[in-house]
Amino acid sequence: MTRFIDRVVIHARAGNGGNGCASVHREKFKPLGGPDGGNGGRGGSVVFVVDPQVHTLLDFHFHPHVVAPSGKQGAGSNRDGAAGTDLEVKVPDGTVVLDEHGQILADLVGEGTRFEAAAGGRGGLGNAALASRARKAPGFALLGEKGESRDLTLELKTVADVGLVGFPSAGKSSLVSTISAAKPKIADYPFTTLAPNLGVVSAGEHTYTVADVPGLIPGASQGRGLGLDFLRHIERCAVLVHVIDCATLEPGRDPISDIEALEAELAAYTPTLQGDSTLGDLAERPRAVVLNKIDVPEARELADFVREEIEAKFGWPVFEISTVAREGLRQLTFALWDMVAAYRAAQPAAVSRRPVIRPIPVDETAFSVVPDGQGGFIVKGTRPQRWVAQTNFDNDEAVGYLGDRLARLGVEDALLKLGARPGCAVTIGDMTFDWEPQTPAGVDVPLTGRGTDVRLEQTDRVGADERKAARKARRQSGDE
């Protein structure tokens, strides 16, 4: 029998970007061909896509690692590396994606809904793209960025029009099996249903879905029984139906007390759905009461006795049925369709949103420098950390290019203001190195006060009059 898995923890890792290529164009009669290294390809991303043919998270239970392909390295003759193909992962309709802290990242409802779970790394630039007037033939290229890697939790919340709630062995699975083609497991012991069962019900020319979920017991909102595993699957149901066992022999139970106990658990749970505010809390959903097992004479008498009291106390429609004798089922299915149709009519019409592209604002203060408490400094920021990760520290020219970029960004000025001295340890990302200040041209910066230059304060320079006097003295000595 196929296992139903509705909660898994997976590790999604996007592909790395390809490295750029450092090469020089070689051709006959062209001694100065110039750089022609291509850029690296972008890494593939991990994308979740809703597929109506997928109904469980079972595949992720056995294969929790999802890895997208990396981009290819650039080549000579200005050939860019191939980009990694995005890995489209099919998930069931109603999947909720949470991060490692339990925050909801996406609520995937509707066929074709997509969510980028992990972004692929950008490819490194080749030396052809790095060429400039100041650096006409770079002897280096940038490395590709690492792909995003994260741990995610996937939760499946059943998407159905009608949800059946009730105590264990109330006849919910039997009801679904008689009004639809679903074949759930049915037995005469509690918690026979361990996973939700979906059935498609036909009411004349109309169809809707019904979810049979595990039985509810007092304390389910705190995790007793199947607890939250049950309650999570009724969050998306537009109509809730209380299935009441009128033939139970358990002491202290009757239809009204069962309904009150079920409502107490729903009120204790009452999660407000994020991203689907039209449904609201569970207390706001339309309800119906089904008095089951009236094929038993005592149960029929009890149902007739409490029906008016239930309608007067709760104000919900009440139906008396027997799944064994198939009595009252047609009236129930059409009544549920009327409730579902009323809910669908109340929903706002879907409006296609025009995509709006907004440029990312440029943050001039995209970094911060803080002392590390040991005489060194830590530079934090998206751009400095990305630049360091793309630098090949085995290439001196690449290291110099990194220093130029950091200087233009203002990192060196910030270090000087904090009292950094040459040789102190500076940490950027995962790299720690000895800092040596430099100008974009590679000349050491004199550590003097602003507005002064020791090269202009030298007083031993020979002037024009002194040079003229020296020449005159040499001529006189030659005449003698």
Swiss-Prot record:
The keyword Magnesium applies. Keywords: Cytoplasm, GTP-binding, Hydrolase, Magnesium, Metal-binding, Nucleotide-binding. Its cofactor is Mg(2+). It is an enzyme of class 3 (hydrolase). Mg(2+) binds at residues 173, 193. PROSITE patterns: G_OBG, GTP1_OBG, OBG, OCT. This is GTPase Obg. It comes from Mycolicibacterium vanbaalenii (strain DSM 7251 / JCM 13017 / BCRC 16820 / KCTC 9966 / NRRL B-24157 / PYR-1) (Mycobacterium vanbaalenii). An essential GTPase which binds GTP, GDP and possibly (p)ppGpp with moderate affinity, with high nucleotide exchange rates and a fairly low GTP hydrolysis rate. Plays a role in control of the cell cycle, stress response, ribosome biogenesis and in those bacteria that undergo differentiation, in morphogenesis control. GO terms for molecular function: GTP binding; GTPase activity; magnesium ion binding.
